[in-house]
Every structure is written in C-alpha cells, then in structure tokens.
Amino acid sequence: MAISKEDVLEYISNLSVLELSELVKEFEEKFGVSAAPVMIAGGAAAGGAAAAAEEKTEFDIVLTDGGAKKIEVIKIVRALTGLGLKEAKDAVEQTPSTLKEGVAKAEAEEAKKQLEEAGAKVELK
C-alpha cells in the first residue's frame, strides 16, 4: 500500500507542537536544510515588505484634531510646515490633515509633542 500526500499531511496535522518541532529538526539534519525564512533582496514589493518588518524610520505627521487652543496650534503648524496663515488655519480646522510626510522619527516625535502640548491630537503614521 502506497502512502499518499494526503495521508502524510493528515498525519502531520495530528502531531503536537513538540512532535512537529522534533520532526522539523530531523528533516533539517537528514536533508541538510534549514527551516529559517529566506530574505529575498531585490524587487520593490520585497523591499516594502522588508521595510515594514523593520522599525519604521520615516513618519507622516497627521493632525487628527485641532483642540480647543486653535491659535496656539496654528502657530505651531506654521512653524513646523512653513505654511501661510490661511493654509495653517485650514489644516487645523479641516482634520484629519497630513502636516508633513516622510519625516525622521525624532523630528516627528518632537512635532507631536509640541502639538499635543498645545492641545491638538496627532498621529504618526
């Protein structure tokens, strides 16, 4: 009687985690392979997936709520972005609004701190 792939899969699916771990180790020894995931460098899709797995280094500063002290928040938005008064006012009043994109982590956290101290709600994406 020949064993089919389905029989093998059924047998493996009934193993406990410990038994499965031992089986993987035996496969590695017998066939000289490793069960570690392979990192593929190259294409844009692979690069994006690898970047997502690592710690994020660039952030978008998104103002989700201008808060009660809108004048203070507008002043900070103008200082951070270089926007004119009308544009900064619109950004604060029409939330959510992205204030800056692709900002370094330290700069993004500092901007978030300043805006939150003025009463605004901010997300780093």
Curated annotation (Swiss-Prot):
Subunit architecture: Homodimer. Part of the ribosomal stalk of the 50S ribosomal subunit. Forms a multimeric L10(L12)X complex, where L10 forms an elongated spine to which 2 to 4 L12 dimers bind in a sequential fashion. Binds GTP-bound translation factors.
Entry GO terms, CC: cytosolic large ribosomal subunit
Molecular function in Gene Ontology: mRNA binding; structural constituent of ribosome
Gene3D superfamilies, alphabetized: 3.30.1390.10, Single helix bin (1.20.5.710)
Keywords from the UniProt entry: Ribonucleoprotein, Ribosomal protein
Record-linked InterPro entries: Ribosomal_bL12, Ribosomal_bL12_C, Ribosomal_bL12_C/ClpS-like, Ribosomal_bL12_oligo, Ribosomal_bL12_oligo_N_sf
Protein name stated in the entry: Large ribosomal subunit protein bL12
SUPFAM superfamilies: ClpS-like (SSF54736), Ribosomal protein L7/12, oligomerisation (N-terminal) domain (SSF48300)
